[in-house]
Amino acid sequence: GKQSTSKSVTREKKDVKKTVAPKKAIKKVTKKSTTPVKTSKAAPASTTPIKDTTPVKADAKKIHRTKTMKESVSDAKKTVHKSAGDKKLSRSQKPAKREAAKKIVHPAKKAAAKPKTAKKEVKKDTKPVKKDAKKDTKPVKKDAKKDTKPAKKDTKKATKGSKKN
Protein backbone atom coordinates (compact mmCIF):
# COMPACT_ATOMS: atom_id res chain seq x y z
CA GLY A 1 0.00 0.00 0.00
CA LYS A 2 2.78 2.46 0.92
CA GLN A 3 4.81 1.55 -2.16
CA SER A 4 1.85 2.10 -4.50
CA THR A 5 1.09 5.50 -2.95
CA SER A 6 4.73 6.60 -3.14
CA LYS A 7 4.90 5.57 -6.81
CA SER A 8 1.66 7.37 -7.57
CA VAL A 9 2.97 10.48 -5.81
CA THR A 10 6.17 10.44 -7.84
CA ARG A 11 4.15 9.91 -11.02
CA GLU A 12 1.89 12.81 -10.08
CA LYS A 13 4.93 14.99 -9.49
CA LYS A 14 6.32 14.00 -12.89
CA ASP A 15 2.96 14.72 -14.48
CA VAL A 16 2.87 18.11 -12.79
CA LYS A 17 6.33 18.92 -14.13
CA LYS A 18 5.27 17.80 -17.59
CA THR A 19 2.14 19.94 -17.45
CA VAL A 20 3.97 22.97 -16.03
CA ALA A 21 6.75 22.86 -18.62
CA PRO A 22 4.50 23.21 -21.70
CA LYS A 23 2.60 26.02 -19.98
CA LYS A 24 5.87 27.88 -19.47
CA ALA A 25 6.81 27.14 -23.05
CA ILE A 26 3.42 28.41 -24.22
CA LYS A 27 3.89 31.60 -22.23
CA LYS A 28 7.33 32.06 -23.75
CA VAL A 29 5.90 31.46 -27.21
CA THR A 30 3.18 34.04 -26.67
CA LYS A 31 5.73 36.55 -25.38
CA LYS A 32 7.97 35.83 -28.36
CA SER A 33 5.07 36.24 -30.74
CA THR A 34 3.93 39.55 -29.25
CA THR A 35 7.19 41.27 -28.32
CA PRO A 36 8.96 41.07 -31.71
CA VAL A 37 5.82 42.48 -33.27
CA LYS A 38 5.90 45.38 -30.83
CA THR A 39 9.65 45.86 -31.29
CA SER A 40 9.20 45.76 -35.04
CA LYS A 41 6.37 48.28 -34.66
CA ALA A 42 8.63 50.56 -32.61
CA ALA A 43 11.70 50.00 -34.80
CA PRO A 44 10.47 51.68 -38.02
CA ALA A 45 8.80 54.43 -35.91
CA SER A 46 6.68 55.28 -38.94
CA THR A 47 4.51 52.16 -38.66
CA THR A 48 3.05 52.99 -35.24
CA PRO A 49 1.53 56.36 -36.26
CA ILE A 50 0.57 54.99 -39.68
CA LYS A 51 -1.44 52.21 -38.07
CA ASP A 52 -3.26 54.84 -36.02
CA THR A 53 -3.78 57.28 -38.91
CA THR A 54 -4.50 54.98 -41.85
CA PRO A 55 -7.95 53.86 -40.61
CA VAL A 56 -8.85 57.51 -40.00
CA LYS A 57 -8.48 58.82 -43.58
CA ALA A 58 -9.89 62.17 -42.41
CA ASP A 59 -7.92 65.34 -43.10
CA ALA A 60 -9.59 67.16 -40.20
CA LYS A 61 -8.75 64.34 -37.81
CA LYS A 62 -5.19 64.13 -39.10
CA ILE A 63 -4.81 67.80 -38.21
CA HIS A 64 -6.07 67.10 -34.71
CA ARG A 65 -3.98 63.97 -34.35
CA THR A 66 -0.72 65.14 -35.92
CA LYS A 67 0.09 67.04 -32.73
CA THR A 68 -0.24 63.93 -30.60
CA MET A 69 1.12 61.66 -33.32
CA LYS A 70 4.19 63.86 -33.84
CA GLU A 71 4.89 63.57 -30.14
CA SER A 72 4.50 59.81 -30.30
CA VAL A 73 6.64 59.69 -33.44
CA SER A 74 9.37 61.69 -31.74
CA ASP A 75 9.17 59.34 -28.75
CA ALA A 76 9.18 56.34 -31.05
CA LYS A 77 12.20 57.67 -32.96
CA LYS A 78 14.05 58.12 -29.69
CA THR A 79 13.31 54.53 -28.76
CA VAL A 80 14.30 53.39 -32.24
CA HIS A 81 17.72 54.94 -31.93
CA LYS A 82 18.05 53.48 -28.45
CA SER A 83 16.88 50.07 -29.64
CA ALA A 84 19.29 50.17 -32.57
CA GLY A 85 22.10 50.80 -30.11
CA ASP A 86 20.78 48.12 -27.76
CA LYS A 87 20.79 45.52 -30.53
CA LYS A 88 24.50 46.17 -31.03
CA LEU A 89 25.25 46.10 -27.29
CA SER A 90 23.64 43.04 -25.75
CA ARG A 91 20.59 40.82 -25.58
CA SER A 92 20.10 41.61 -21.89
CA GLN A 93 18.94 45.11 -22.80
CA LYS A 94 16.28 43.84 -25.22
CA PRO A 95 13.66 43.20 -22.49
CA ALA A 96 14.08 46.79 -21.27
CA LYS A 97 13.66 47.91 -24.87
CA ARG A 98 10.53 45.79 -25.18
CA GLU A 99 9.14 47.27 -21.98
CA ALA A 100 9.87 50.74 -23.33
CA ALA A 101 8.12 49.82 -26.56
CA LYS A 102 5.13 48.54 -24.59
CA LYS A 103 5.05 51.73 -22.55
CA ILE A 104 5.10 53.80 -25.72
CA VAL A 105 2.44 51.72 -27.45
CA HIS A 106 -0.02 51.48 -24.57
CA PRO A 107 -0.43 55.18 -23.59
CA ALA A 108 -1.02 56.03 -27.23
CA LYS A 109 -3.56 53.21 -27.43
CA LYS A 110 -5.18 54.31 -24.16
CA ALA A 111 -5.33 57.92 -25.31
CA ALA A 112 -6.44 56.92 -28.78
CA ALA A 113 -8.78 54.11 -27.77
CA LYS A 114 -11.37 56.00 -25.75
CA PRO A 115 -12.09 59.12 -27.88
CA LYS A 116 -10.61 58.02 -31.19
CA THR A 117 -11.91 54.48 -31.70
CA ALA A 118 -15.53 55.62 -31.79
CA LYS A 119 -14.62 58.36 -34.26
CA LYS A 120 -12.50 55.94 -36.26
CA GLU A 121 -15.32 53.43 -36.50
CA VAL A 122 -17.74 56.10 -37.67
CA LYS A 123 -15.44 57.30 -40.42
CA LYS A 124 -14.40 53.76 -41.31
CA ASP A 125 -18.04 52.96 -41.91
CA THR A 126 -18.90 56.14 -43.81
CA LYS A 127 -15.86 56.57 -46.03
CA PRO A 128 -15.68 53.10 -47.62
CA VAL A 129 -19.40 53.41 -48.25
CA LYS A 130 -18.74 56.65 -50.13
CA LYS A 131 -15.96 54.99 -52.09
CA ASP A 132 -18.17 52.02 -52.87
CA ALA A 133 -20.97 54.36 -53.90
CA LYS A 134 -18.64 56.14 -56.30
CA LYS A 135 -17.42 52.82 -57.64
CA ASP A 136 -20.98 51.64 -58.10
CA THR A 137 -22.27 54.86 -59.68
CA LYS A 138 -19.48 55.25 -62.24
CA PRO A 139 -19.98 51.85 -63.94
CA VAL A 140 -23.73 52.43 -63.79
CA LYS A 141 -23.30 55.69 -65.69
CA LYS A 142 -21.18 53.89 -68.28
CA ASP A 143 -23.84 51.23 -68.63
CA ALA A 144 -26.50 53.92 -68.88
CA LYS A 145 -24.72 55.46 -71.85
CA LYS A 146 -24.33 52.07 -73.50
CA ASP A 147 -27.80 50.71 -72.79
CA THR A 148 -30.45 52.60 -70.90
CA LYS A 149 -32.70 49.62 -70.16
CA PRO A 150 -30.10 47.28 -68.60
CA ALA A 151 -28.64 50.28 -66.73
CA LYS A 152 -31.81 50.43 -64.64
CA LYS A 153 -31.34 46.78 -63.77
CA ASP A 154 -27.70 47.46 -62.95
CA THR A 155 -28.62 50.31 -60.62
CA LYS A 156 -30.89 47.98 -58.68
CA LYS A 157 -28.11 45.39 -58.51
CA ALA A 158 -25.60 48.03 -57.45
CA THR A 159 -27.82 49.33 -54.67
CA LYS A 160 -28.50 45.82 -53.43
CA GLY A 161 -24.81 45.04 -53.51
CA SER A 162 -23.92 48.24 -51.66
CA LYS A 163 -26.51 47.41 -49.01
CA LYS A 164 -24.99 43.97 -48.61
CA ASN A 165 -21.56 45.50 -48.30
UniProtKB/Swiss-Prot annotation:
The modification Phosphoserine is found at residue 83. The modification Phosphothreonine is found at residues 48, 54, 117. Its main location: nucleus. The keyword Flavoprotein does not apply. Cell-growth/division-associated phosphorylation by a CDC2-like kinase. Is additionally phosphorylated on either Ser-33, Thr-34 or Thr-35, and on either Thr-39 or Ser-40. Keywords: Chromosome, DNA-binding, Nucleus, Phosphoprotein. GO terms for cellular component: chromosome; nucleus. Residues 20-31, 103-117 have a biased composition (Basic residues). Residues 1-165 are annotated as: Disordered. The keyword Secreted does not apply. Residues 9-18, 68-89, 118-157 have a biased composition (Basic and acidic residues). It comes from the Eukaryota. Residues 32-41 have a biased composition (Low complexity). One of its GO terms (molecular function) is DNA binding. It is found in: Nucleus; Chromosome. Transmembrane segments: none annotated. Histones H1 are necessary for the condensation of nucleosome chains into higher-order structures. This is Histone H1.
